[in-house]
A protein has these predicted regions:
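Alpha-helical support elements that line or immediately flank enzyme active sites
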Residues: 1-3, 153-175
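Generic recognition of stable, solvent-exposed alpha-helical segments in well-folded globular domains
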Residues: 14-21, 46, 77, 110, ...
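Short, conserved secondary-structure transition motifs
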Residues: 25-33, 188-194, 222-223
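Short Gly/Pro-enriched turn/cap motifs at secondary-structure boundaries
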Residues: 71-75, 127-133, 217
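Active-site lining segments that contact anionic ligands and/or coordinate catalytic metals
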Residues: 77-79, 110-112, 135-137, 145-147, ...
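Active-site rim segments in enzyme catalytic domains, especially the processed small/beta chain
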Residues: 85, 90-149, 157-160, 173
Length: 223
């Protein structure tokens, strides 16, 4: 969907509106991904073009802007993401989560890890061979048949939007990876677009320029 926009030419207001619209339509489409032909559908450029044109038929959000109550800062976390590269050129992107409150609190002798407890919401809904729906998104980007970028994130449903925006900052705006990671991000949820606004984030617009945003302090804790 993003390939149909000239992202490098957008100002910040246009950028926020564009990503908000795209995230909304993409999240509405996610339930279709558990069907047998879901991979073919996800990779289809024609289907992406169809979704792009559907953006003109609906608006991303309808609420007026407002300060969101409190800060969204996770005090604890249970997801680990890492990327690693090796001398021989191999690269991995890895995301592992065990679920809240130390997972199942069960471990097997000698194995050294706790078992996860994150599939409770899926029980009875899947048949053998199906994969549980998840937001974790370990990602490897290639260019000219070679490695270009590896990344992922922790953060539940914000993972997908964060990874997408960082990749776009690198590819579409030509940023270095560290600068792309530092840029403020948005997150669309429940017909409201949340704008990251913690210390160090600078936006070049006033919140009333985008009528459907919420200003929110959300950030990942560094351990």
């Amino acid at each position: 969907i993003l390939s149909h926009f000239n992202i490098d030419e957008l100002d910040q207001v246009e950028w926020v509106k564009m990503f908000s619209d795209v995230f909304r339509i993409a999240y509405l489409d996610r339930p279709k991904q558990k069907y047998e032909d879901s991979l073919e559908l996800i990779l289809s450029k024609d289907y992406a073009k169809k979704l792009f044109h559907s953006l003109n038929e609906s608006k991303a959000s309808k609420r007026t802007n407002a300060e969101l109550n409190g800060e969204w800062i996770a005090d604890i976390g249970h997801t680990t993401d890492l990327s690693a590269s090796y001398n021989d050129g191999n690269v991995i992107s890895f995301t592992q989560t065990i679920g809240p409150l130390m997972g199942s609190k069960v471990a097997s002798d000698g194995l050294g890890f706790l078992y996860a407890v994150t599939l409770g919401g899926y029980l009875g809904d899947y048949k053998p061979g199906d994969r549980a729906n998840s937001h974790i998104s370990p990602t490897i980007v290639t260019k000219d048949n070679g490695f270009y970028l590896s990344l992922g994130a922790a953060g539940g449903s914000r993972i997908i939007t964060a990874v997408t925006q960082v990749i776009s900052n690198v590819i579409d705006k030509g940023m270095r990876l560290d600068k792309a990671l530092e840029k403020g991000r948005i997150y669309h949820v429940n017909d409201t677009t949340e704008i990251e606004n913690h210390d160090g984030i600078v936006w070049e617009f006033q919140k009333d320029e985008i009528p459907y945003i919420g200003i929110c302090k959300f950030e990942a804790k560094t351990l």
